């Protein structure tokens, strides 16, 4: 049985710092406002708050273009606001993790500006330069937006490398002074009280550290882990790792690198299951996954702040997911993914959105919820690229969705105000008034998951079920067994279960009131409604 750490029991809630709530009325979300909404986040059952970047930034890439890693952008607040937010969160039982964006900086960062001016500058080797771009380098991350990962800089008289946007030059992660700067960043924020970091673009920075060879770059993760653990043994590193399934093991190491890894592999196959209304794709993905080392785990989610990346599941499967969830060309991006939020992808069907959450919370690993998914927020396809899924939180039917008291024209990003997902219809205040709303369903699921934490750290057993629309996962601890079932199909079914332990299985969570119960033994059968889910437990004492 795996050693259980505090994060194995976690439920993470991701907040876009600029879009969650605006306390001072300038139209821009801020840290003081997030502090005011901590009770809401905690009421959902969340135990960890993940903040997207709030550092000094030109804001050309939603804050991931950082010009000072140690200073909050004044639009978000001050370092005092950060410390107060962390302290208040801790009082409520919430830990706070922040972004560690070290694969690149903003082109406006003082390091890059100094590097451009003088080839003899000590900051010149902080970045990757070339007189002529290599012929066989990686393609750009944003095809159709960027033509190459190399950009000519007139002032520097050389090309610089940028894996992402041209205004985000890549750091030279094989250069010791850069690593020393990163150590200072980690130290600063751990001393401020954060409980860990989400390591942005982890697979790309490994390649940079190894000068194109991932094998030589993995030790950087070991080093970062050592730095973090030396300062706070409880702090975590959560890595953004989109790689082939067999390569995840390198990011865990022997349990001495990343403790938590975002499971892009499983996320892609989850959407294939939802598109096909069959459990088989998720089953296939789970069977292929590596087992995390002791003290480590995968992290699962439904949708994040980027596109749904479908690379790696095969062209035919990718086309099927896109055809199902992004039938219009405007819904796809970068030739690889879907730029929609969860609720519009599932046609606003509360049953189906609830099912997706039930699957998320049943999967082995730690769940992440993105702000707004719990109420079924929509997207704004008039916004470019990934910004379609980055709109203000919808708190009420009041002006600006209750997000800000600023004039609507003063909002940098406006709430969704038309269509079936408009804020006048989809908002927290309205959802709280209806006992069967998606918000209440998701909250009940999460609260159940925080009590039945077996998926966070225990090995799972995949059940062979008929019909194949139903996903079945069984977890066993020293004191109980937990059975989780989910029907991916819109058709009601009767599930034939494999032999289970004799005795009565107590219901934990159900999508509706069912007339039948579960007793173990052979040939047990259970009813499941279309997009239904049922969780059970059985004591071993």
Go through each PLM region and give its residues:
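Active-site and adjacent substrate-binding regions of carbohydrate-active enzymes
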Residues: 1-541
